[in-house]
């Protein structure tokens, strides 16, 4: 797989608790996969991040996961974010990481 998946931790409370590295990653990737785009758009707008975003959540994790893995196979770099915190802890991120390992 030539593309990469970035697991990006987002602030639990104050939006300004995000790291510079995560902000740079969110601006540089080809696509952001967000657990809840309605919440994540607030973060992206606050920091003027214009990267395209798609939903990736509990109810579409298998189908959307396959789409995201295929995009990475084609060279796309994707950032995975959750509503708050680190992907893979109490959210569908674990499933996408597993799919990437199997690809």
Segments (PLM) and residue ranges:
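Short glycine-/acidic-enriched loop or helix-start segments at secondary-structure transitions
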Residues: 17-18, 43-44, 65, 89-92
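Glycine-rich, flexible N-terminal cofactor/catalytic loop recognition
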Residues: 1-59
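Glycine-rich, highly charged phosphate/nucleotide-binding loops
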Residues: 60-68
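Short alpha-helical
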Residues: 38-39, 63, 87, 95
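Short glycine-cluster motifs
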Residues: 74-103
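Short, glycine/charged-enriched secondary-structure capping and boundary segments
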Residues: 21-24, 46-49, 68-70, 92-97
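Short loop/turn elements that form and flank the Walker-type P-loop nucleotide-binding site
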Residues: 1-2, 49, 73-75, 101
């Amino acid at each position: 797989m030539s593309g990469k998946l970035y697991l990006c931790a987002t602030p639990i409370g104050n939006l300004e608790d995000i790291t510079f590295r995560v902000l740079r990653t969110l601006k540089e990737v080809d696509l952001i996969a967000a657990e809840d785009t309605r919440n994540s758009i607030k973060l992206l707008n606050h920091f003027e991040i214009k990267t395209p975003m798609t939903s990736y959540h509990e109810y579409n994790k298998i189908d959307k996961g396959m789409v995201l893995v295929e995009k990475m196979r084609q060279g796309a770099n994707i950032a995975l974010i959750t509503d708050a915190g680190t992907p893979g802890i109490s959210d569908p991120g674990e499933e996408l990481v597993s799919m990437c390992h199997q690809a």
